[in-house]
Amino acid sequence: MPYRLLLNHLDVISEKGLNPEIYFSSDALDSYRPEDAIRIARVLADHNASVTIHGPFMDLSPGAVDSTVRKVTADRFSQALEAAAYFKPRAIVLHGGYNRWYFNGNKKLWLERSLLTWEPIRKRARELSIPIAIENIFEEEPSPLKYLMDALGDPFFGICFDSGHFHLFSQVPLKQWFDSLGRHFIELHLHDNFKNNDDHLPIGEGEINFDELFNLLRQHDIHPIYTIEPHRVEDVDRSFNAVCQYLGMKEFKTEAFPPGIAESLL
């Protein structure tokens, strides 16, 4: 949920008992006021909301060969951590940036440059007690992220597994991701698609095998943060209730959101 959306509709979000994943874009990081963040965090805490944060990602590359690009990326990630600290989140989701085509398959180069970015970010995240969850995006198989996890060897530094991105880009079975990275899963992003667009559909409305995914979670005894990612407000109920069926939870009803809140849901 974009920060500006939360800022404008805090009363609705808190009254409906939502646990938001707050997205701080680069623009939001440049424009937010600490006093607003403190107020929002207090209201969410008063409503016992559980919060996660999603950091900026557009144009950023923690494994960039260009040191100036890495510096901009590190600066943005640092800003996101400081903004996140107001909310005492369960985790902050950031992107690792590996793309086989961009790096010409050179995972070693990407990893070496990535570690230059992540070491100070990881240190600050530990000081703030905010676990970092790296989200899979364009990775075709889990080894780049596995190399990163092994190199850092920090339980505070894990994975946000995105079901939709897996389905779009992975060239290997879901089981291979769980066998390789499952023990590092901090969070799941749950949405569906038909493998031709990042549609962010409610689970069960595309072609992803969520029976297999939840069976693997049980087999590996993984208990992550579950985050639904509908991009349309009319999909919120169906997204939540589809996950409820797998988790044995009660159904969820948003009733009617006010005009304007449906513009964008992360």
Residue ranges of each PLM-predicted region?
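Hydrophobic faces of well-ordered beta-strands that scaffold small-molecule active sites
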Residues: M1, P20-I22, V51-H54, I92-L94, ...
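Acidic-and-aromatic substrate-binding clefts and catalytic sites of carbohydrate-active enzymes
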Residues: M1-N8, F24-D36, S61-G63, W101-Y102, ...
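Alpha-helix-loop-beta-strand connector modules within alpha/beta enzyme cores
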Residues: I40-M58, R113-E127, F210-L213
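Histidine-acidic metal/acid-base catalytic patches
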Residues: L7-S14, P142-F157, H167-L266
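N-terminal pre-domain/capping segments
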Residues: M1-L81, A85, K146, M249, ...
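Active-site acidic/histidine proton-transfer and metal-coordination neighborhood
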Residues: G63-G158
